Amino acid sequence: ITNNNNWNQVCNGGMIAASIAIAERDPELAASTIKRSLDGIPHALEEYGPDGVYPEGSTYWGYGTVFSVVTNAMLESSFGTDFGLGDYPAFKESALFRVLMNAPSGGYYNFADCGDARSSNGDITLAWFASKSGDEMYFERDRLLRSPSKIGRLRRLDGAGLVWLAQYEKTMESSLPTFWQGGGANPIAV
């Protein structure tokens, strides 16, 4: 799977999860599948370059990126490394893109085929970036740590975010730039 869109992240992440699950029973199959997926994922990660802009907009950033960060977490948990995927050029910088796409209306700045509705429960994918960077800008505390009665229905991978929230340790607090531009397949300026 070597396409350059979010389906790459979804499929290769799933193949890695399945391979980890069967590794004790069939280590050769697991190893070859993981290698193939590790070779394929960079094709999708290239789309974040050079500055973190995701060409399909913020909604698809959330969809594809959550599968990347879950995959990175699985690899770290199983092998002690994510094999460099989390440090792929412009991947970590893409968290700033996501934050900058939050419009004053409370929705997302809408471009490409991106929807504009934000989850009221906070951005669990940004929690991974907060845990890795220590930057409070990516920890949506007021949206992530609400009372259970206000949370409502969780999304498919929100449970993984509890680990990242537990791992978060504030080491820095950056602020939003007054001007930002990002290049790539769908350049933008904010």
Regions found by a protein language model. Name each.
Residues 1-57, 163-179:
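Active-site lining segments of carbohydrate-active enzymes
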Residues 22, 60-190:
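Carbohydrate-active enzyme catalytic cores, enriched for enzymes
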